[in-house]
Amino acid sequence: MGRTLENKKEIVADLKETLGESTLALVIEYQGLTVAEITDLRKRLRPSGTVCKVTKNTLMGIAIQDDEKWQPLSELLKGSSAFLLVKEDFSSAIKAYQEFQKVTKKTELRGGVMEGRLLKEPDVKALGDLPSKEQLMGQIAGAINALATKIAVGINEVPGGLARALQAVADKENGGDDSAA
């Protein structure tokens, strides 16, 4: 039995809502994957805040129709498409997909869209090579902490250096007085 018009409208509304929350959309060719493999992919993507949607290209086309941000996605709507809709951590999501691809060797990444720009496979791989959000925050925090430590050491060094200079002058004067007496 086919889908009713009401059911299709619900699917399109759900796609629009998910796209509205997403920063990146990837399109993969999923033909040949079993239900268990799709479930495995979804489990791998879940920690990164990514949703895997398997839907008809025409329904996705209707969902992106009024949103300029996702218009380039229409070029990728052909064949058996699964859509990876990434909400936050795109680097982790891409890495999770790449790990899945290494294991199954059954999917093909067609491309993606981010901020209204069409991404080809090399672009997506470059995004996957970026550090995750947590790693970037750790690197920034480490850099800020190192800078603060250097400033604190520098500030503490000024009075210490001044004290050593004064002590050297005092020792020199005392040493000069001792030889004169």
UniProtKB/Swiss-Prot annotation:
The gene is rplJ. Belongs to the universal ribosomal protein uL10 family. Part of the ribosomal stalk of the 50S ribosomal subunit. The N-terminus interacts with L11 and the large rRNA to form the base of the stalk. The C-terminus forms an elongated spine to which L12 dimers bind in a sequential fashion forming a multimeric L10(L12)X complex. Coiled coil: none annotated. Gene3D superfamilies: 3.30.70.1730, 6.10.250.290. GO terms for molecular function: large ribosomal subunit rRNA binding; structural constituent of ribosome. The keyword Electron transport does not apply. This is Large ribosomal subunit protein uL10. Forms part of the ribosomal stalk, playing a central role in the interaction of the ribosome with GTP-bound translation factors. It holds the Pfam family Ribosomal_L10. One of its GO terms (biological process) is translation. Keywords: Ribonucleoprotein, Ribosomal protein, RNA-binding, rRNA-binding. One of its GO terms (cellular component) is large ribosomal subunit.
